[in-house]
């Protein structure tokens, strides 16, 4: 995620980091060079009686813009839902530890439970990003629990099970009443709902055929556009063609980024920072001495 302070409108025009321009610059360069080639080809295909007009491109451009808008809205809806889910995880984690800490007197046992919660947040983050987990989870889990988690097809769900087992032990030992156990178990169910929601987004992409149709249409439109512009604009064709192509290709590229909000690209959710915030909050609630430093945006204003 790009966390950039407010800038003057003129400076914002030339912003590079955080823009999709770095991804599509090669496409725009090819479009510019192809437009120059079309200028030199103009006498040849005019001699053949071939004439392109702007009318069909105007109609097609409007249609593409509408469907790109629909696709970007769908991608942004996934992004917003993903952020809401991680917000719910933060709320449920704080509430669960608060209830456990104010109910159970054993600080050592509560510390173990807090580390299970932190491990869950990091495990969910790394699962969604398809990152190796053993090294990070080893800081929070016991050896036997770590082995169970790493052997599971759903590591985050396994940690939830271990948390449920921990609550069950406290109940059998008489530390928790049935009412408190049910209340705390409901918190675990809230966290489980977050896990299922994140998996739903991560494993259900926007239908490929829909994406492919738009992608093909956008690039074919940008390839054919110089032939229609050159009749009226001539030497200005490369510049106008690149400007129009930038609008369509950048929207197509941005939609691809928003489709998977859990990645590590510029416009994805800052899961590292969210997990860091959860860890800091839970450790401070438990009066821990060693608190990790808060993750801040880098020099390019990117928060991962």
Question: What is each PLM-predicted segment?
Answer:
Residues 1-87, 106, 233-235, 280, ...:
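N-terminal juxtamembrane/topogenic regions of multi-pass membrane proteins
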Residues 3, 245, 249, 254-304:
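Cytosolic/matrix-facing juxtamembrane and C-terminal tails of multi-pass cellular membrane proteins
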Residues 10-22, 179-180, 186-217, 263, ...:
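Membrane-interface, cytosolic juxtamembrane amphipathic helix immediately N-terminal to a transmembrane helix
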Residues 33-50, 218-248, 252:
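Juxtamembrane "helix exit" motif at the C-terminal ends of alpha-helical transmembrane segments
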Residues 75-79, 88, 99, 250-261:
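Membrane-spanning helices that line or support transport/gating and their immediate boundary helices
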Residues 87-103:
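Amphipathic, membrane-active segments
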Residues 98-208:
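Structured inter-helical modules in multipass membrane proteins
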Residues 210, 225-228, 236, 262-266:
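Long amphipathic all-alpha helical oligomerization modules
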């Amino acid at each position: 995620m790009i966390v950039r302070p407010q800038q003057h409108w003129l400076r914002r025009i030339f912003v590079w980091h955080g823009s999709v321009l770095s991804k599509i610059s090669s496409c725009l360069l090819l479009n510019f060079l192809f437009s120059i080639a079309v200028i030199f080809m103009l006498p040849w295909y005019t001699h053949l009686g071939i004439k392109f007009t702007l009318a069909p491109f105007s109609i097609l451009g409007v249609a593409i813009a509408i469907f790109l808008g629909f696709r970007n809205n769908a991608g942004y809806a996934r992004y917003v839902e993903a952020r809401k889910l991680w917000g719910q995880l933060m709320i449920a984690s704080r509430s669960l530890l608060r209830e456990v800490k104010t109910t159970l007197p054993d600080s050592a046992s509560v510390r173990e439970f807090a580390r299970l919660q932190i491990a869950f947040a990091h495990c969910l983050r790394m699962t969604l990003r398809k990152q190796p987990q053993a090294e990070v989870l080893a800081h929070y889990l016991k050896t036997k629990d770590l082995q169970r988690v790493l052997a599971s097809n759903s590591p985050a769900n396994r940690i939830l099970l271990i948390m449920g087992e921990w609550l069950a032990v406290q109940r059998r030992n008489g530390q928790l009443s049935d009412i408190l156990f049910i209340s705390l178990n409901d918190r675990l169910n809230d966290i489980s709902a977050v896990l299922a929601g994140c998996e739903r987004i991560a494993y259900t992409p926007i239908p490929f055929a829909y994406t492919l149709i738009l992608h093909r249409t956008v690039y074919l439109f940008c390839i054919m556009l110089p032939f229609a512009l050159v009749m009226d604009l001539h030497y200005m064709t490369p510049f106008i063609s690149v400007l129009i192509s930038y609008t369509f290709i950048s929207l197509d590229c941005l939609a691809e980024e928003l489709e998977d909000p859990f990645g590590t690209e510029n416009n994805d959710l800052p899961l590292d920072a969210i997990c860091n915030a959860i860890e800091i909050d839970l450790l401070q609630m438990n009066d821990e001495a060693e608190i990790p430093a808060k993750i801040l945006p880098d020099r390019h204003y990117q928060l991962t």
